[in-house]
Amino acid sequence: MRTGEIHRVTGETDVSVRLGLDGSGRCQASTGVPFLDHMLHQISSHGLIDLEITASGDTHIDDHHTNEDVGIAFGQALSKALGDRRGIYRFGHFVAPLDEALVQVVLDCSGRPHISWGLTIPTQKIGTYDTELVKEFFVAVVNNSGLTLHIRQLDGVNSHHIVEACFKAFSRALRMATEIDPRRSGLVPSSKGVLEQAGGS
């Protein structure tokens, strides 16, 4: 079982993440940010990732610090679970619809953090959640997991649908990239024989 566990404490937040890549999609998420919890359930359920996340933070100010720090801890736990990335497929791609919304995610477990962002979310809020925090979450994940991540919105007008389709596509692409390739025979999926590791500290 490939797992990663992180407990991260700052002056603004206290975040614990336990992540299992070879799971069944069990999720317990309690971050104090209800919409973020809903999206973490999408990652777990559709990626078949077992996920336990708890967070407390200065949400009396706003959700920014908690949202970002959950992304940081998730990325670090993912990097730990992947280890040296031996035997994985490495690349993943998925296009997810949700009613009128359609979002494409392509990713590479390369060890080289990069995000190319292509969502246009029409409203500033989804419930109480500030929609600019969606990008901040993924930036934090990418910088601490070493993913190369491309996100493209192909269609959509409803903010909730667009964001949820994004998280669903991300989860399925991540599942594809991190599953074990039986033909790889435990080797690192790189012509160099090594992939960089990120987010360990």
Curated annotation (Swiss-Prot):
SUPFAM superfamilies: Ribosomal protein S5 domain 2-like. Its EC number is 4.2.1.19. It comes from the Bacteria. GO terms for cellular component: cytoplasm. It is found in: Cytoplasm. The keyword Nucleus does not apply. The keyword Repeat does not apply. It catalyses: D-erythro-1-(imidazol-4-yl)glycerol 3-phosphate = 3-(imidazol-4-yl)-2-oxopropyl phosphate + H2O. PANTHER family: IMIDAZOLEGLYCEROL-PHOSPHATE DEHYDRATASE, IMIDAZOLEGLYCEROL-PHOSPHATE DEHYDRATASE HIS7. Gene3D superfamilies: Imidazole glycerol phosphate dehydratase, domain 1 (3.30.230.40). Keywords: Amino-acid biosynthesis, Cytoplasm, Histidine biosynthesis, Lyase. One of its GO terms (biological process) is L-histidine biosynthetic process. It comes from Synechococcus sp. (strain CC9311). Pathway: Amino-acid biosynthesis; L-histidine biosynthesis; L-histidine from 5-phospho-alpha-D-ribose 1-diphosphate: step 6/9. Belongs to the imidazoleglycerol-phosphate dehydratase family. This is Imidazoleglycerol-phosphate dehydratase. InterPro entries: IGPD_sf, ImidazoleglycerolP_deHydtase, ImidazoleglycerP_deHydtase_CS, Ribosomal_Su5_D2-typ_SF. NCBIfam families: PRK00951.1-3, PRK00951.1-5, PRK00951.2-1, PRK00951.2-4. It is an enzyme of class 4 (lyase).
